[in-house]
Amino acid sequence: MNEQEKFIPKRDIRVDWQLIAEMIKPGSRVLDVGCDDGQLLAHLTETKNVDGRGLELSQAGVNICVANGLSVVQGNADTDLGFYPDGGFDYAILSKTLQATHQPHVVLEQLLRIGQRAIVSFPNFANWRCRSYLAFKGRMPMTHSLDTPWYETPNIHFCTLKDFTALCGKMGVTIEQTVIVDASGKVMTRTNYGAFANLFGADCIFMLSKKKA
């Protein structure tokens, strides 16, 4: 495998990855769905000693992961999660991939079937920057989290903090933890965002589990 196909470890790990890592217990079994070039999976392996597996749509991404010694296979979150066994992992992670799936609610069901817990992160489309961009420019918003033009983006199902919370309620999913990050990358606390998380939050991270019968 050509050395150029390997990733260069990032000096500053993405903020949502750091926060996801904090949610995971050391030594856990982890499935990273939509793992791209494996940066998060490698970070979890190094810092939490996880037994990590990955699923990635892009063959180029899979090649980079394998070149770096990660256990990753090529597959589609919409169609291939059904091949994984019930409860095969402690955590099933979907990091900024939900909005690119065709049936987000079905993918969530699969994550919660496969993992004891699901950790999902996504850009909040109700952030004030998105609202003002659309209101004043009349064009599809482009922000730090949404940095691809509408005609090239893989994102097809944008959602907001309130949308996702409502979906979890409709599906009977337990929200164990919610972390909201503002545009500067700082974690927002209840004292500084109160009821305005949906307006000022740029990225959302949820840890979910099935409701106990």
Feature names for model-found ranges:
Residues 106-110, 117-212:
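S-adenosyl-L-methionine-dependent methyltransferase catalytic module, highlighting the catalytic core
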Residues 34-36:
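Class I SAM-dependent methyltransferase "Motif I" SAM/SAH-binding loop
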Residues 2-13:
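Class I SAM-dependent methyltransferase Rossmann-like catalytic core
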Residues 11-27:
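Conserved alpha-helix/loop element of class I SAM-dependent methyltransferases that forms part
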Residues 91-103:
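A short SAM/SAH-binding and catalytic strip from SAM-dependent methyltransferases
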